[in-house]
Amino acid sequence: LNLKVTLGIQMVLMPEFKDEIIPFAKLAVDLGVDYGVIKHCSDDEFGTLGVDYSKYEEMYDLLDEAEKLGNENTKIIVKWDKIQDKGKPSYKRFYGPQFLLQISGSGLVAPSGMFFNARYSKLHIGNFVDERFKDIFKSDAYWKIMNYLASPSFDAQTMMGTLPIQHYASTALDMHIKGTSRIQPAHDEPPLHVNFL
């Protein structure tokens, strides 16, 4: 088909699986995928998975070694920022969902995959099985939920799981709003995967 695609594999790293870091990196290189990503494991706000984020630091040398296994064909990428954050975001307001909504396999539209569970039904924006996504996006429910997540009534450090996919957007927007690091227009080449699905 001669399509321009990028192939990657991911490892969701829990401390008890540290012995799998190097084999994972070697597998990515052996398969010849474009990248192998090693990222932290998100836990919910109750710590249901029991992830001990303090133990990630003990794996830094292994993660460095894994990155060095990459070559010109396969990049081994460690999501250092999230791993080093030890499960706690620097922000309390959750601004990221306005830029990166998530949709479940059932069609449920929510601000984050962390909110797909029925216990978060008040944060369910709609379901595109029943209505057009455009209508969901323009709905009062959308804005009510987005405004709530960005308000002092919501605390991202205690009221949701750890470091969701919207983490980087929320961090950048929080620093911009606080004036600690302003978001600047990009002048470089557009990044790959701007329309990642």
Task: Indicate where each model-derived feature is located.
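Radical SAM enzyme [4Fe-4S]-AdoMet core and its adjacent flexible, acidic
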Residues: 1-131
